[in-house]
From Swiss-Prot:
This is DUF1769 family protein duc1. Residues 158-189, 381-505, 542-606, 630-658 are annotated as: Disordered. Promotes the proper distribution of phosphatidylinositol 4,5-bisphosphate (PtdIns(4,5)P2/PIP2) synthesis at the cell membrane. May bind phosphatidylinositol 4,5-bisphosphate (PtdIns(4,5)P2/PIP2) and is required for robust anchoring of the contractile ring to the cell membrane. Interacts (via FFAT-motif) with scs2 (via MSP domain); the interaction is direct and serves to restrict the localization of duc1 to areas of cell membrane-endoplasmic reticulum contact sites, and away from the cell division site. It comes from Schizosaccharomyces pombe (strain 972 / ATCC 24843). The modification Phosphotyrosine is found at Y374. Residues 555-564, 587-601 have a biased composition (Polar residues). Residues 415-426, 477-487 have a biased composition (Basic residues). The modification Phosphothreonine is found at T376. The lineage of its organism: Eukaryota, Fungi, Dikarya, Ascomycota, Taphrinomycotina. It is found in: Cell membrane. The modification Phosphoserine is found at S477, S493, S574.
């Protein structure tokens, strides 16, 4: 027997679906809903619309435990609130032979996952249903093509969406769930005023209504019994059933609503109003009051020349220069590890080299956990080689304690404890103390020596017996951060002193009188000293953390001795032909004080500054125009914050493009994402969304579906294998096919319909097992082949 998957606007009007073909979703245009539906089935070996060989699998299932997925996007043709649309399974008749204990156990598990689920055995068509807005695994939205220019979007950063499954509750035969367990589902007609304000309510956060908690507390995470093993990507578009928390966070473009809503009235206010009087906007049930002045300052729209990093959690409209590019990425999650050359936008010169090495996202040091920063070059190379290898038993600290390091017989916790040198707080305190010491060195050599003595005494107290390991980790971490985060800032004038990155590496590096040298303090006798060329008027740059903001030039090593820092010299080799002596930071600081003996002279267009201990030569422009620092170039650090536009693949299903826009998921590397900012005004997890809409009928009735919005959902499960109809959920392991057909043949039918009318159906997806030579299927396949020949 083979699996037949059919899709239609109701049970009487269906067609065979192209299973696992991302570029061929089934188009549905009924009286209540218009949209596209895509079905994926693992190890599919069933019927195709034209009788061609089936596509057995999809990239979607790689690294996941899911057995099937239903993905639907579309628009409602009527006005509904959140309580008037339900989704679930509906049968043709009652299943009399299904074990009662198994049914009760299954319903308890279903209610544990989705608290709003309910069933009715004795209805004309028995069903197991739940409110659509509460039960789907992911929910997102974007504006219809006719309202695209009115959209308000924002770049959102959120935790990784979680795994497929979670630990299941204990099962006993006395457990049962019915309609009586839930609040009444009778729909109260909407008032006239509510019907008028449908558009406003759809984009405003209903959680601010009286007696509704503003931010529901997510339940505590529980260990998963079935691991997801999603090794494909940095992030996953899974359901939100929490397992172990993941380190990484992802960024995506989110749809917040329409600009004509009172919620976004501040976006139409001029950007600069210095002394505007406090004028309050029109208020509604779900909109807070904002003054014009506060809206113009803290919530003003982003300007065209504003840095990309400022886009995070900021609302932008069609006035933004890249709006048309970003609005096409709404609701999409790209899995960059499936294609190492696709990930995030970076600088034009930097990005190509970074992508070749398979690094698509550089983490932010300030948001990164301390233990995640202890990487070495050896670990990085080894991880790149093994990133596609599957491992059954992964060490969660494998990036920190890589087996190839051969660090000894230390246990993982003990080794991590030894490697975690100091906390961020102590590092910041040390940085502040270094700043004070540097300022003291500027005025007195004696005070510099005193500060050095105190610093040496402090290092003795904090030193650890792992100096070689510290240096290995430190140098690897600095090199990794330096290579991917920094570009050299050029000092140029109007006369045209210009230099590229490649030319600078080849040219001689001259020493400026205002050069700053920096010594990174570590609890070890070995120090890493970095120096860089900078404007003499610039202030000293402080290293604030393990991989803080560092200059992009040379790195040298000096050994601490009993000689005061002011008497030590360091040598820099710029080229094989030229060797320039440079002083330490103490002497450079002293040279800038009034007591320093500096004799500036002009020789052939160059400035020569003579001191007692060193001579420094610096190029000087021929013009009298003052040197100015150019505007910083956006490097990989800032550009990596913006998700790269997903590669669009044209779809064969384009008849509904005028109503829905182009199909966005023909690329198998793209998944629908959980994006509910249009509901709550900010990102909430799947569990928080489910908990909120399952908590009361009042919450569902205060959410409205907008006819100008395309809603996208995905529904999946790792428990049901439709190729065999084997159900495996918790203690339940049985084949449901024989029970379904004991009293007459019937398929498993998922549908979205109205709550009060079982005949008011938006769409259906049927799964059925049929014989290979089923006449109905053969006739439908022949009809499809004939249609394709004509077109």
């Amino acid at each position: 027997m083979k699996l037949k998957v059919s899709i239609g606007c109701d049970a009487q009007h269906t067609q065979i679906a192209w299973v696992n073909y991302e570029g061929r979703p089934t188009e549905v245009d009924g009286p209540l809903w218009v949209g596209r539906i895509l079905v994926r089935v693992r190890d599919f070996d069933g019927f195709t619309p034209d009788g061609s060989p089936p596509k057995r699998d999809s990239e979607y299932f790689r690294g996941r435990s899911r057995k099937f997925q239903i993905q639907a996007e579309g628009r409602f043709k009527k006005e509904y609130n959140g309580d008037q649309v339900i989704y679930g399974t509906q049968f043709d008749h009652m299943i009399s032979t299904f074990p009662e204990s198994a049914f009760r156990a299954g319903m308890r598990i279903a209610k544990y996952i989705d608290p709003a689920v309910y069933y009715d055995k004795y209805a004309r068509s028995p069903y197991i249903m739940s409110p659509f807005v509460a039960c789907v695994n992911t929910l997102s939205a974007w504006p219809a093509p006719s309202r695209l220019e009115d959209a308000v979007i924002s770049l959102v950063e959120a935790d990784s969406q979680e795994s497929d499954t979670e630990s299941l509750p204990e099962i006993n035969d006395s457990s049962d769930v019915s309609l009586s367990d839930l609040p009444s589902t009778n729909v109260t007609p909407k008032k006239t005023t509510t019907q008028i304000d449908v558009q406003t309510n759809i984009v405003t956060p209903p959680i601010t209504v009286t007696a509704v908690p503003d931010s529901p507390n997510p339940p505590a995470a529980t260990p998963a019994t079935v691991a997801d093993n999603d090794d494909l990507s940095i992030v996953s578009s899974d359901s939100g059933n929490t397992t172990a928390p993941r380190k990484n966070r992802h960024r995506y473009w989110s749809f917040a609503g329409f600009s004509d809503s009172t919620r976004f009235s501040h976006l139409n206010v001029p950007a600069a109003i210095p002394d505007a009087p406090s004028v309050k906007t029109e208020t509604s049930q779900n909109v807070s009051q904002l003054s014009v002045k506060s809206a113009a300052t803290s919530l003003a729209p982003v300007e065209d020349d504003e840095d990309d990093e400022l886009l995070l959690h900021r609302h932008i409209t069609n006035k933004h220069k890249d709006f048309n590019l970003h609005v096409k990425q709404l609701g999409l999650l790209h899995k960059p590890s499936l294609d190492l050359e696709e990930g995030y936008i970076m600088d034009e010169n930097y990005g190509k080299d970074v992508y070749k090495h398979g690094i698509s996202n550089v983490p932010d040091d300030e948001n990164e956990d301390d233990l995640q920063r202890y990487f070495t070059a050896l670990e990085m190379q080894q991880d790149q080689k093994e990133q596609h290898k599957k491992s059954k038993n992964k060490d969660p600290f494998r990036k920190i304690t890589h087996p190839s390091l051969h660090l000894g017989k230390f246990s993982t916790p003990k080794l991590i404890k030894r490697m975690s040198l100091r906390s961020k707080k102590s590092l910041r305190n040390d940085s502040k103390s270094d700043d004070v010491g540097n300022s003291t060195h500027r005025f007195s050599t004696a005070s510099a020596a005193s500060t050095s003595a105190v610093k040496t005494e402090k290092e003795k107290k904090m030193s650890a017996p792992r100096r070689s390991l510290d240096k290995l980790i430190r140098i690897g971490s600095l090199h990794r951060h330096h290579h991917h985060h920094h570009k050299t800032d050029l000092i140029e004038s109007d006369s045209g002193i210009e230099a590229s990155e490649s030319n600078r590496r080849k040219s001689d590096i001259f020493s400026f009188s205002g050069r700053n040298s920096f010594s990174v303090s570590r609890p070890s006798s070995s120090h890493s000293t970095l120096s860089y060329a900078n404007d003499s008027a610039s202030s000293a740059v402080n290293v604030a953390g393990e991989t803080g903001s560092l200059p992009p030039l040379r790195e040298q090593t000096s050994i601490t001795s009993g000689v005061p820092p002011s008497n030590r010299l360091k040598k820099h080799v710029s080229t094989p032909e030229k060797i320039v002596e440079e002083r330490s930071i103490d002497e450079v600081s002293q040279s800038n004080t009034p007591s320093s003996k500096q004799l500036p002279q002009s020789v052939d267009g160059k400035t020569v500054t003579a001191n007692a201990n060193s001579t420094t030569v610096a190029k000087q422009p021929t013009s009298n125009v003052a040197l100015t620092r150019p505007k910083p170039v956006r490097t990989a650090t800032s550009q990596s914050k913006i998700p790269k536009p997903v590669k669009h693949i044209p779809s064969d299903s384009n008849n509904l493009d005028p109503q829905l826009g182009p199909w966005r998921f023909a690329n198998p590397k793209v998944d629908p994402i959980e994006d509910n900012s249009f509901i709550f005004g900010e990102h909430k997890s799947v569990k928080e969304r489910r908990k909120y809409f399952s908590s009361s009928k009042f919450c569902r009735e205060n959410f409205f579906y907008d006819k100008d919005v395309v809603y996208c959902m995905s529904f999946f499960s790792p428990h049901m294998d439709f190729n065999t109809f084997n159900l495996n959920i918790g203690p339940i392991r049985l084949n449901v096919y024989k029970h379904l057909n004991s009293d007459g043949h019937q398929p498993i039918r998922y549908m979205m319909r109205e709550t009060d009318d079982e005949d008011a159906v938006m769409f259906v997806v049927e799964f059925d097992l049929l014989e290979d030579d089923d006449e109905t299927v053969l006739a439908e396949q022949a009809k499809e082949r004939e249609r394709r020949k004509q077109t």
